[in-house]
């Protein structure tokens, strides 16, 4: 019996492969546990179409992320904070605060706090480079300017 694997199966094959298996193993284990489907032309064509659609969707998402990174690199985000006598901020600037200010000043950019990578806490005024990891290997950098109120 030929089956189309829906997920990786140890000692048999990887997802998307068509494998020849014994009837009992195919029916009682693979198909019953939804690890495979009977490999008919219709099932194979449907699976290929789903894979193609998924790849197109991922390519579109990656293109949108790359465009967002290009936009981010042109931005300098300004954050006004109260400063103590020694020049340090009252509290550190957090990822949440950066995303809120970004939404206020640039509404078209919608970043989540988990996308922002802070190497160390921002506790004084100055210009800092903030790294953004958007997934799919897309990484960008933008600047924030911390100014005393």
From Swiss-Prot:
InterPro entries according to UniProt: Ribosomal_bL9, Ribosomal_bL9/RNase_H1_N, Ribosomal_bL9_bac/chp, Ribosomal_bL9_C, Ribosomal_bL9_C_sf, Ribosomal_bL9_N, Ribosomal_bL9_N_sf
Cellular component per GO, a single term: cytosolic large ribosomal subunit
This protein's record includes keyword Cell membrane: no
Domain of life: Bacteria
Annotated HAMAP family: Ribosomal_bL9
Role noted for this protein: Binds to the 23S rRNA.
Protein name (database record): Large ribosomal subunit protein bL9
Organism: Helicobacter pylori (strain ATCC 700392 / 26695) (Campylobacter pylori)
Lineage, top ranks: Bacteria, Pseudomonadati, Campylobacterota, Epsilonproteobacteria, Campylobacterales
